């Protein structure tokens, strides 16, 4: 904890040209002063000023001048079965040794979904009413069972569980920890969890880099983007924890993907087989105009994500000799990193990750009263780092193209509005996937009354273990197939 005299801190802020945030300090209550002081102590004001100057210097540099097609991609449904099995075997072996971890980005609140709780709490409407967090936890639980079955019980999931690193934000940290505690970690080992929070940084004015006060007693702070992960891994001790536990590969995903394939053995095995230190799962663009970032190579031949706003019109529609879009592979924030890569980023490259600017409407304090005001137009910058900005530092990067219908259905928008990426589309997609599990195992589906179908991850992770129960049977929807196998 910072024990520097608060008056010294105040003087430093004044010297750095940020003394205006204290304009209302003398009028605050004792409790407000204490909270304000705590906020101030978390911020390195010199670093804020440095970041602002760097943003100004880098604005032109961030315009991509040259880019090429990224070729190092394998398509999952076109891979030879022998290769897929080889990669799966490698992945399972790495998991059995306790060398694979999962890393969850869980800093988001479900504000666009009409709530203020962490997005991982959300229930999209499955018969079981399971939250996103529970679905993910049960997938890890089932994967550990499959590893144990594969190694005839010799794998000890108590001594070598799949480690789960969960990055929260200031808004979600304590609630997330309490949620898992109250649920007894869904049967997983408490020692397998490592919770840590990403940093909050001040919003600033574009014209002069002044820190914005949300009110007289509170600074306007926002999370530093998913690229803040790498510094948070270092400062929280997560990197040291990974080193101590012998982690070799870390698979990363976002909390809102209801179809996430946790610690996918094929993906990990593919990376290991290719001696890659960085990997990403990608999907084919649904349309040339789909507003997503795509994998590409920069002018130095290094992998990076070409954002939709950066790609020219001709390149959006450009096709190869097979009729496929040249810039076709959309980055969906499902990545994997070798531990050595993460360690190298934390030690050598944190300062090389540049901030990106978002011009936003940011509540600010009335200049006299200090009361919170909501602007009618954008008035400030939020600075964010992006997770994919580490890709150019990779020595070898590979991508695995997956099917959206099996592995990617994000929850972004509220329900009842006929919007994409909503609770309704998530429920539709997971139901369709689970219906395919039943049908591929010889069962039949009667969807005359409903389209909702749920197969518990504790029963089947990817369609395995169902044939003896569902073969030649008809299931009337809605249905939940759980551990009792009697619904």
Swiss-Prot record:
Residues noted as binding UTP in the record, renumbered to the chain: 105-108, 119, 198, 225, 256, 382
Short motif Substrate binding, span: 105-108, 307-308
Recorded superkingdom: Eukaryota
EC number annotated for this UniProt entry: 2.7.7.23
InterPro entries documented for this protein: Nucleotide-diphossugar_trans (IPR029044), UDP-sugar_pyrophosphorylase (IPR039741), UDPGP_fam (IPR002618)
Known pathway: Nucleotide-sugar biosynthesis; UDP-N-acetyl-alpha-D-glucosamine biosynthesis; UDP-N-acetyl-alpha-D-glucosamine from N-acetyl-alpha-D-glucosamine 1-phosphate: step 1/1
UniProt record, GO biological process: UDP-N-acetylglucosamine biosynthetic process
Main location: cytoplasm
One Gene Ontology term, aspect cellular component: cytoplasm
Protein name: Probable UDP-N-acetylglucosamine pyrophosphorylase
Source species of the chain: Dictyostelium discoideum (Social amoeba)
Record gene name: uap1
């Amino acid at each position: 904890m910072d024990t520097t005299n608060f008056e010294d801190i105040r003087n430093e802020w004044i010297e750095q040209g940020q003394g205006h945030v204290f304009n209302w300090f003398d009028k605050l209550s004792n409790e407000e002063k204490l909270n304000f002081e705590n906020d101030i102590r978390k911020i390195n004001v010199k670093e804020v000023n440095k970041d602002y100057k760097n943003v100004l210097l880098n604005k032109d540099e961030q315009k991509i001048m040259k880019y090429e097609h990224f070729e190092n991609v394998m398509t999952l449904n076109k891979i030879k079965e022998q290769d897929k099995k080889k990669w799966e075997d490698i992945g399972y072996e790495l998991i059995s040794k306790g060398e694979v971890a999962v890393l969850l980005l869980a800093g988001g609140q479900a504000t666009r979904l009409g709530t203020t709780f962490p997005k991982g709490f959300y229930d999209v409407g499955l018969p079981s009413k399971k939250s996103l967090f529970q679905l993910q936890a049960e997938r890890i639980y089932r994967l550990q069972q499959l590893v144990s079955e594969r190694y005839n019980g010799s794998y000890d999931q108590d001594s070598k569980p799949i480690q789960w690193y969960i990055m929260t934000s200031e808004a979600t940290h304590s609630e997330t920890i309490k949620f898992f505690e109250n649920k007894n970690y869904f049967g997983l080992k408490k020692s397998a969890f490592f919770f840590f929070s990403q940093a909050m940084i001040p919003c600033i004015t574009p014209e002069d880099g002044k820190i914005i006060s949300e009110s007289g007693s509170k600074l306007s702070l926002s999370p530093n983007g998913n690229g803040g992960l790498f510094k948070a891994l270092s400062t929280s001790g997560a990197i040291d924890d990974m080193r101590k536990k012998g982690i070799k590969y870390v698979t990363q995903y976002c909390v809102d993907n209801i179809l996430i394939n946790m610690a996918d053995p094929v993906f990990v095995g593919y990376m290991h087989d290719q001696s890659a230190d960085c990997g990403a799962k990608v999907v084919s663009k649904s349309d040339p105009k789909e507003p997503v970032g795509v994998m590409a190579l920069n002018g130095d031949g290094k992998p990076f994500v070409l954002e939709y706003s950066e790609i020219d019109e001709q390149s959006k529609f450009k096709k190869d000799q097979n009729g496929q879009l040249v810039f076709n592979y959309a980055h969906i924030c499902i990545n994997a990193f070798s531990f050595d890569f993460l360690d190298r980023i934390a030690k050598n490259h944190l300062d090389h990750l540049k901030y990106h600017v978002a011009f936003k409407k940011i509540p600010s304090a009335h200049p006299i009263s200090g009361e919170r005001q909501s602007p009618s137009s954008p008035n400030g910058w939020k600075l964010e780092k992006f997770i994919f900005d580490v890709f150019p530092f990779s020595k070898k990067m590979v991508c695995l193209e997956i099917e959206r219908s099996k592995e990617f259905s994000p929850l972004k928008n509220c329900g009842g509005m006929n919007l994409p990426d909503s609770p309704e589309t998530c429920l539709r997609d997971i139901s369709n996937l689970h219906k395919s599990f039943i049908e591929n195992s010889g069962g039949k589906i009667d969807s005359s009354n409903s389209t909702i179908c749920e197969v518990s991850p504790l029963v089947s992770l990817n369609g395995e273990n169902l044939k003896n129960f569902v073969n030649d049977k008809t299931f009337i929807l809605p249905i939940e197939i759980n551990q009792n196998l009697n619904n």
